[in-house]
Amino acid sequence: MAPSTLTALAQEKTLNSKFVRDEDERPKIAYNKFSDEIPVISLAGIDDDSVDKRSQICRKIVEACEDWGIFQVVDHGIDIDLISEMTRLARQFFALPAEEKLRFDMTGGKKGGFIVSSHLQGEAVQDWREIVTYFSYPIQARDYSRWPDKPEGWRSITEMYSDELMALACKLLEVLSEAMGLEKEGLTKACVDMDQKVIVNYYPKCPQPNLTLGLKRHTDPGTITLLLQDQVGGLQATRDGGKTWITVQPVEGAFVVNLGDHGHYLSNGRFKNADHQAVVNSNSSRMSIATFQNPAPNATVYPLKIREGEKAVMEEPITFAEMYKRKMSRDIEMATLKKLAKEKVLQDQEVEKAKLQMTPKSADEIFA
């Protein structure tokens, strides 16, 4: 049976138990307590003939990738009208009646469409979000029957948007290729036939946002991700294993750029894979549009260049399909172990409770 949407659950006073996370996974800072630690980099002049201007921009990008694996770009050349239209139509889709959205339900392994929430196999707790997924590259593999046909015009706008974002991603990969001492197309070529999917995230208002996450902590498996977010706030990043978190300051018209595991491995660990999550709030719904650029399944994953004195961060070359499979297996195993540990604690508590109830009473208690 197709799931209901989060709209009804968002109206309740308490959070449904399937979204309640363990204390160690709950938000540590507020969705709107913004930090300016993530650099905002202007790309104005990156294509100019001025070597100095380009080198300055490239240096800032490289430093951000070495420091956080995440940064924001402005003056990126993407038409502001296209961005506005993509955002407007996405909001209209999520405002549709549940039955309209669920016509594109992608549960059961369907390639693209709408889905309510998300969680790993073996994990009980779900993320507080609704999603539309477009598999947009390779172009010849697009299945337009899985692309929502409402609101009118969204399909064609998404096509234009995905093309523009692919071009921007490749431009940023050129910068990182040069920084690694490779030819401009080094990282792009390593992806073979680059894959892309566009995921539109909708995070409804939440009755108890301190108990859940819109999207649990993770790193992206692919090469590079470009995220367009609204001004509400909720994207958070960490670089110390989750001990401390910052909320990324939303910047109007900017794209948040973060590197994934594939980009991390190709750079031999020089560039960080951004460790991030999304939190929700009880005041405003939030929307973001993430565009993931990934290598082809058969692309080789291994450092493209190993600097003198360094060791490879991988034992052997593997395909991206195998890398992704191992990542998912590890995540599922960790989720399963955590679930079993939680169940064991509850069982132990029940046993202790039963023992206390069976403890013989003293004579004073019996004759009281």
Curated annotation (Swiss-Prot):
Residues 191-295 form the Fe2OG dioxygenase domain. Pathway: Secondary metabolite biosynthesis; flavonoid biosynthesis. InterPro entries: DIOX_N (IPR026992), IPNS-like_FE2OG_OXY (IPR044861), IPNS-like_sf (IPR027443), Oxoglu/Fe-dep_dioxygenase_dom (IPR005123), Plant_2OG-oxidoreductases (IPR050295). Keywords: Dioxygenase, Flavonoid biosynthesis, Iron, Metal-binding, Oxidoreductase, Vitamin C. 2-oxoglutarate binds at R286. It catalyses: a (2S)-flavan-4-one + 2-oxoglutarate + O2 = a (2R,3R)-dihydroflavonol + succinate + CO2. Binds 1 Fe(2+) ion per subunit. One of its GO terms (biological process) is flavonoid biosynthetic process. Its cofactor is Fe(2+); L-ascorbate. Fe cation binds at H218, D220, H276. Its EC number is 1.14.11.9. One of its GO terms (molecular function) is L-ascorbic acid binding. Involved in the conversion of (2S)-naringenin to (+)-(2R/3R)-dihydrokaempferol. This is Flavanone 3-dioxygenase. It comes from Petroselinum crispum (Parsley). The lineage of its organism: Eukaryota, Viridiplantae, Streptophyta, Embryophyta, Tracheophyta.
